[in-house]
Amino acid sequence: MPNGTKIDVSAFVSDYNEDFFGNDGIEKLQTWLNKNQDLCPIVEDAIRLGAPLARPSKIVCVGLNYAKHAAESGMDVPQEPVLFFKATSAIVGPFDNIIIPKGSTKTDWEVELAIVIGKTASYVSKENAINHIAGYVLHNDVSERAFQIERSGQWVKGKSCDTFAPLGPFIATKDEISDPNKLNLWLKLNGEI
């Protein structure tokens, strides 16, 4: 809610998944809330929040998408985007603990803005891409850099460990964020920015 209050809408929807987003779920939920919001139980702050969407069919990520991060990694900004996948089993809630994998020596974290695609999409024009976006969600892109970079091969082995994709605490719909390029993102580690 705009005032920060969290409400339980499970009387309307059991999960935010591809079926929900693909069938105008956000619009239907808003219509339902207009009539039923006062009946929804309040979710207390002590309640654990899971990820704000169910496991999607895929998580596509863009690597080295910030010049500063590329420089920190000792890499050039690529001419062509570096794409990689994260396993959907990496998804956890926004405040869940991250499990450091056995043998990890260089676990790292990056705050990212994830785009939630709300419609099935293939070969979409740049001009029409915005019509497929359901919203935006914060994503902590956790990585084990030794697995990812020093052991060669695919990045997935350093990016897809269980708990390496905390999401949330909520999805902001595209009408709530007029220009995602102007957002100021930050991350806290052990209480420090």
Label every model-predicted segment.
Residues G50, P56-I193:
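Glycine-enriched loop-and-adjacent helix/strand subsegments that border the catalytic/binding cleft
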Residues M1-P81, D175-S178:
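N-terminal non-catalytic cap/leader segment that marks the start of a structured domain
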